UniProtKB/Swiss-Prot annotation:
UniProt name for this protein: Collagen alpha-1(XI) chain
Lineage, uppermost ranks: Eukaryota, Metazoa, Chordata, Craniata, Vertebrata
Record-level Gene Ontology MF annotations: extracellular matrix binding; extracellular matrix structural constituent; extracellular matrix structural constituent conferring tensile strength; heparin binding; metal ion binding; protein-macromolecule adaptor activity
Organism: Homo sapiens (Human)
UniProt-reported outcome of changing residue 676 to R: In STL2; overlapping phenotype with Marshall syndrome
Comment on protein domains: The C-terminal propeptide, also known as COLFI domain, have crucial roles in tissue growth and repair by controlling both the intracellular assembly of procollagen molecules and the extracellular assembly of collagen fibrils. It binds a calcium ion which is essential for its function.
Amino acid sequence: MEPWSSRWKTKRWLWDFTVTTLALTFLFQAREVRGAAPVDVLKALDFHNSPEGISKTTGFCTNRKNSKGSDTAYRVSKQAQLSAPTKQLFPGGTFPEDFSILFTVKPKKGIQSFLLSIYNEHGIQQIGVEVGRSPVFLFEDHTGKPAPEDYPLFRTVNIADGKWHRVAISVEKKTVTMIVDCKKKTTKPLDRSERAIVDTNGITVFGTRILDEEVFEGDIQQFLITGDPKAAYDYCEHYSPDCDSSAPKAAQAQEPQIDEYAPEDIIEYDYEYGEAEYKEAESVTEGPTVTEETIAQTEANIVDDFQEYNYGTMESYQTEAPRHVSGTNEPNPVEEIFTEEYLTGEDYDSQRKNSEDTLYENKEIDGRDSDLLVDGDLGEYDFYEYKEYEDKPTSPPNEEFGPGVPAETDITETSINGHGAYGEKGQKGEPAVVEPGMLVEGPPGPAGPAGIMGPPGLQGPTGPPGDPGDRGPPGRPGLPGADGLPGPPGTMLMLPFRYGGDGSKGPTISAQEAQAQAILQQARIALRGPPGPMGLTGRPGPVGGPGSSGAKGESGDPGPQGPRGVQGPPGPTGKPGKRGRPGADGGRGMPGEPGAKGDRGFDGLPGLPGDKGHRGERGPQGPPGPPGDDGMRGEDGEIGPRGLPGEAGPRGLLGPRGTPGAPGQPGMAGVDGPPGPKGNMGPQGEPGPPGQQGNPGPQGLPGPQGPIGPPGEKGPQGKPGLAGLPGADGPPGHPGKEGQSGEKGALGPPGPQGPIGYPGPRGVKGADGVRGLKGSKGEKGEDGFPGFKGDMGLKGDRGEVGQIGPRGEDGPEGPKGRAGPTGDPGPSGQAGEKGKLGVPGLPGYPGRQGPKGSTGFPGFPGANGEKGARGVAGKPGPRGQRGPTGPRGSRGARGPTGKPGPKGTSGGDGPPGPPGERGPQGPQGPVGFPGPKGPPGPPGKDGLPGHPGQRGETGFQGKTGPPGPGGVVGPQGPTGETGPIGERGHPGPPGPPGEQGLPGAAGKEGAKGDPGPQGISGKDGPAGLRGFPGERGLPGAQGAPGLKGGEGPQGPPGPVGSPGERGSAGTAGPIGLPGRPGPQGPPGPAGEKGAPGEKGPQGPAGRDGVQGPVGLPGPAGPAGSPGEDGDKGEIGEPGQKGSKGDKGENGPPGPPGLQGPVGAPGIAGGDGEPGPRGQQGMFGQKGDEGARGFPGPPGPIGLQGLPGPPGEKGENGDVGPMGPPGPPGPRGPQGPNGADGPQGPPGSVGSVGGVGEKGEPGEAGNPGPPGEAGVGGPKGERGEKGEAGPPGAAGPPGAKGPPGDDGPKGNPGPVGFPGDPGPPGEPGPAGQDGVGGDKGEDGDPGQPGPPGPSGEAGPPGPPGKRGPPGAAGAEGRQGEKGAKGEAGAEGPPGKTGPVGPQGPAGKPGPEGLRGIPGPVGEQGLPGAAGQDGPPGPMGPPGLPGLKGDPGSKGEKGHPGLIGLIGPPGEQGEKGDRGLPGTQGSPGAKGDGGIPGPAGPLGPPGPPGLPGPQGPKGNKGSTGPAGQKGDSGLPGPPGSPGPPGEVIQPLPILSSKKTRRHTEGMQADADDNILDYSDGMEEIFGSLNSLKQDIEHMKFPMGTQTNPARTCKDLQLSHPDFPDGEYWIDPNQGCSGDSFKVYCNFTSGGETCIYPDKKSEGVRISSWPKEKPGSWFSEFKRGKLLSYLDVEGNSINMVQMTFLKLLTASARQNFTYHCHQSAAWYDVSSGSYDKALRFLGSNDEEMSYDNNPFIKTLYDGCASRKGYEKTVIEINTPKIDQVPIVDVMINDFGDQNQKFGFEVGPVCFLG
């Protein structure tokens, strides 16, 4: 055969020739390619010599034209093991790049296995053809392409249907086409390299893959590989024609006499494979007679297929499988099921276990010991070969296979089959160019989300009995047989494949070695040699330890069914048979009566967009739209006509003071006036002579904190101090970074004997061993399953009526009766005392979205918009209406100096002057007497509900109620008496297959078999001790499949199952019919702002509007003129402070005082010791309905509701607001002269009149409204301090403002003396509005008033941001203890005071960064002895004295003063890096560094500090005193204060322009600005990290690193999460102790944990050695029930406690399987005496007689007849009762009694 590459060489040579040469060469080329003989695989593998496992059979045609007989084919059985070197098939050494694979095959029905596998020299599979229900073409070239997930899978093809199929596969360029039976053609993409190379240096295996257990079984007639990709299209014409055509010379290529194709035979065929047929992609073109075989499969076959074809695991076994099989054009249901189960990597077994339709009765299947599970090589098969053929993201293999991968299989690290690790995902490819024949449909998308569960339908009538099911799945394989006798030693074979990694790790097994061992195993089996010579004697192994006793083996397999015996006489009446499986679903019942109206459903999803409607009619005139944005300024219009004169403006401000006029003539001497007010303080006099030495003054208040002094020089080394007490353990530091790998340590001593390793992967089947000796007789097996139900006896005679039985015990307490009529209201109780302020509750869950709130206050005006572009000049507008009153005019210009006025008359007595300035605060007054008794407080809150009262006496018997609804079908009645023997009936039909019988007697010993081939000698194992005799015998050979049984009788209806877990989401159903219109939906969200409507007509005048809210403060007014200097007051003499009097004797006790106001909260006490645990309280009655809580924050916006029905016509609305003025109408005609109009507005200002005579002084006007605040005037001269004014009355408390932003924390102020509480003034009546007076000038700001009366302590506010720590204050002297004053109202912030005394110890904060150690100060000189000072700081601890007697516990002392700082200790070890510390004091300015790069834009800085108070202005002139007005309402907010000083922005936060300016300022102002850039990025990074952490705390994700508290929390945070497994951490500490649970969101967010493997339950048994009435944990095989998380780990006790604290109720199911044993109610005795008893987690026994929260969902064991079960549910609000940890069984011990049970999960609902 010529090399395949010659075809390409020839093609390159063709370009240089003419058209004639081109045509000739093409014909030659065709002869050359087509003439190359196909590779006959069957011939190369020696099929015609019928090797082991291969036999000849009838082929595709039983009678072929022009042939003597039928086609010849070969039957391949499981014993066939055929392989050959690939070069034997391709002697030229090259595999064609484009090729066809042609085969005619009839696989065994339902099989899925590889027909051919080609491996390279490294053992990697390059080509594989897998046939079965969904054929797969595996291809991997030398570059590893395509990836396993891209292997072509032909889902629409089923070859394993038990029929002959002619299959042709064409591989050309990057597509692969499969043609089945010459009709069905499917094309898939094949993403391989441009020059894909297939290595021929390996081996080719037929019928399987290396290390694969699935083996091809079936018939094959032909298997060819040819280098022509077009040959696949002519397979049915030239290679395997129909039966009515004669076979070509090479049709049955397996015959030995046909060696090769004659070129002349092949060249005659005209290859008409048109482009049209080849270009179709994924389309399936087939004739009308071809049907999809898969559609006809029944459901049972589908299930069968699943069991046989367990590739991996099923993700949604019980939910995705459709329950019907149809022949319509739906997607093929079988294909869908298979795709799901075949492709996903989830754990098949765990899903099957949770399913209600279990395929296996055996409950003990799980991921650890089930034979169904994939083992190591199968897991590798899934991951390496198939993974997922859908476009789903694939999870890492260790997640996909879970426990299915053995412990020693590390898929992610060790390469599989010699592969390297997968590379990173490549970049996105170029856009595809769709060529003809290249378009491939993608796989169907994943199923849509589950729809909302519909309401349950009415129960249909019982359906007809179902058809008998197919044969059940095959049983689990038997235990492995006993080891054969050791074979003779073989030859030694050294493999140089083991090579170690680095020096620190033992030898690893390489992929090459594993592959080589497999290839050698194949070669060894295929080329079995003669027995080798005797091997070397191995060294004796160490003596093994005694093995543990083996577990008792399971019962043996049932023996073959014996011949049917003669029918005996009818036996006694049999026990009722086991409940049959549920029949098939009945036909659809008649529609039931309409049910009651259901609750309102959730808002549906938004509907599909409807068709575009017709254009609507023009709607009515809309209301005027909102004002539009400011347009661009238009050009100046034409000047309009002069407007009408406006109304007179308000009175202007006072003009500036005129210049003094000329002096008038002296007037008459006036009458002496009354003495004037006291003048202002005179100027400071000269200092007097020094006075005598005064008495020492009282101790002054501590001064303010001085600045930090410069560091002193280092002092001498002090003596080492005494060792301090050991500090409390600090919080754990953050985990450090991972250190570098250390050097390899020295070889340690040999470790102890390790545990027995996990079983290795399943080996290749060994050769048959020599038959062993006959074993000893086994022990008696366990009871077999009960026999079949006997034939039904004749009906007995009716028994006599029995006597009336004794009166039964009192039944259980009935359900709570309906509520009686409401009683008369009781007498009103006395008013309770006012309760204390409660502790704020935990934050509630966010409520549902509240109704739309009322309109908020008007917002602040927005910022000015950008200037618009210049508009077009407008037309001159119409003459406008008369404008409103103009604003108050600005202050007029200064007028001319007036003429000297005439002489004035003598003035009258002036009014009394205004009160003087407020004096300083007086000294603190004495403590007042107790006030009078206050009025009785409001009634207190209702008390807690009392304990439930004792049970009341039995009430009178009620009237007979109406007949109740039909009861449940009662249990089966007692067995009747045996009837007489009937006549012998006709032989019945064959019964259903019997349940497992007792093992048959041992057969005779067979003849000794031929000795098997010599095996390879195993390694010498250690000599084990003699094992105990095994119980289970060798498994029998697999029997032939039995015939399908006849139809079984209909079983009784099955019990109600316990509620199953929620299935996964089904596919979205079709859109249903439109429902009846629902109620009107809630108002939708506000729509987007509509476009402004057209201008409507002018509306009628609206009603008077409600008075608007107080407006915003106006801008600052213009500056006032400077006032004249006021008179100075006299200096008052301060009185001397009296000395403290002697302490008086104790007076007689006074009468008890009235209850004082609530005191200020005291200092936080230390943590108390936890008290003893209280007993579980009684279950209280339901409390009264609580007060409505505060509205929660708005919930998320719901889905768009469906449009509601049109509402009824509304009533006439109020008259709308006045519309905007309409456009000017046309000019009307000249009207007649009108009548005299009303008085016109005042005319314009007249000319200035002459100066009139001075009028008489007018009476004082009413006080005018407060004027606007003026701008601060220039600083006046400092006036003398006035006398102290009387304290003002306390103002009414203002309304509580909204909480402001956290300001920067100020320095702590000094501790002031407690002020006297001001008496609360009674609110005066609201006065009438006064007449507006002239604007008054600003008064000086008053001194802060004394503190107001104490308000009640409010709830604790939100925690403020942490401020910087204050500097340590100087020690103050100990003051005298004053009486406790009442808490004052919140005063203005005080000045900075000294640091207060030490508070109680706070909780340990986060560990800060270690600060820079300060320099040690010098030791000062001793000062002179002063007066006795306050107690000094605590000295160093003395030497420990003798231990005294324990004294009584004293009262808690006052906090002590801060001790002196001790000398510095020795430098400790370097600590872990702490959190960032507080900012240190600024250091000296360093040298200027190089300007750094611009940092990121920081957040906006804090608001600036308030500016300094402006200088006091000059005193204004005294105005006339007005009459005192009534107290007015609180005024509007004051005008804005002066702007604060701008703190220099940080360079890192400012723009470039500002930063350059700042740097220039830095150059000018030397040391003003610190370098803040260091550490800012770290701070912002920390803030961002904190923000993310807080987000995760608020909305946890349920992952291991971000767990939720409970599943309920997770549902509230993410209501769209599906049911499944999530991580929770109930105690919310470090997430390291979180654990994984199952969250059942369908049931409201339940948190479910499961019992462990040994606590799940026990199989039904008679338990002969156990006593009734004992706990299961006391049984020989019993134990306390324990529970695990989903990962199989035990749950921390603390976590369990927290989970219960967060739970409101919990539930758990318990299923009791019985045979003649009662579980709850006993029908025979009519009592609950034999009811099960459960032991709760709180050691409380629970049963029927003491726990009302236990009920039975189904009680089949009550009749004590036959096999039944009882399902018990514990649903309790007493969380400590579950999960149950033990169960007491009372009804067993008789010979026929048996029981078993299953324990369900416990689910907590928060």
